[in-house]
Amino acid sequence: VNVPRAPLTPYHAPPKPVPLTAAFAAVLLAVLTALAPAAAGAQEQVIRGGDVLYSSTGPSCTVGFNAGRGAERYALMQGHCVRDAGLVWYADAARTVEVGRTEGVSFPGDDFAVIHYTNPAFTYPGELSSGLPGGAIEITGAAGPSVGQQVCHAGGTTGLHCGTVVSVNDTVAYPEGTVFGLFRSHACVEPGDGAVPAFSGGTALGLIVSGASCSSGGATFYQPVVPALQAYGLTIS
């Protein structure tokens, strides 16, 4: 009896595994890293006008406005605050995160100082921290004040408060000396407001250097920002 044979299935050896080279592994890791979602809780680190910086010697001072010169970023601040505050500035009260160093101080005579930001992990936009529901206030330029012009500031105590410029070229006497060329408004300040920046619309006008409470009439004096910008070749941006 002839029994038919079943057809034979050809045998193919499995392909040999391709070794994972170091170069290929590095490329694969880079691709997977790029596709991975950002770590939970990661937030952009920002310092705006109206934020507080902490000095190496103890005092803290409020940033007036951020400004630029080329690719470098700077902060305008009160001269009489920075004068006694040391060279190094930190973003935190524990003084562990250095963000800048004092570039120069003009006080008395004027009342402004310039801090050079040195920490690339932060951004320093031309915005003000308002503490209001609308968020940050965008500042796009600077100008000198004029009598009758509206002026506003967002303080930690009074919130957003506005008034009118009532005089320019005013003088204030400090124990350390006299400051000239200030302007004045009736937009009052209260303890806790700090040396907040003053603006009109999207235009930087000045830095508060002294003021009276709202209950006493609210005369507030400001250092104009334009002389400070011109002295260091800076622009608000």
Residue ranges of each PLM-predicted region?
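Secretory targeting and sorting signals
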Residues: 1-42
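Noncatalytic regulatory segments and standalone regulatory/sensor domains
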Residues: 2-5, 41-55, 60-67
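Hydrophobic alpha-helical membrane segments, chiefly transmembrane helices and signal peptide h-regions
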Residues: 25-34, 64-65, 112-114, 210, ...
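Generic anion/oxyanion-binding catalytic loop in active/binding sites
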Residues: 31, 137, 217
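Short, conserved glycine- and acidic-residue-centered signature motifs
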Residues: 42, 108, 191
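Active-site region of chymotrypsin-like
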Residues: 46-59, 126-133, 159-237
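Serine endopeptidase catalytic core focused on the charge-relay Asp
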Residues: 55-170, 199-201, 205
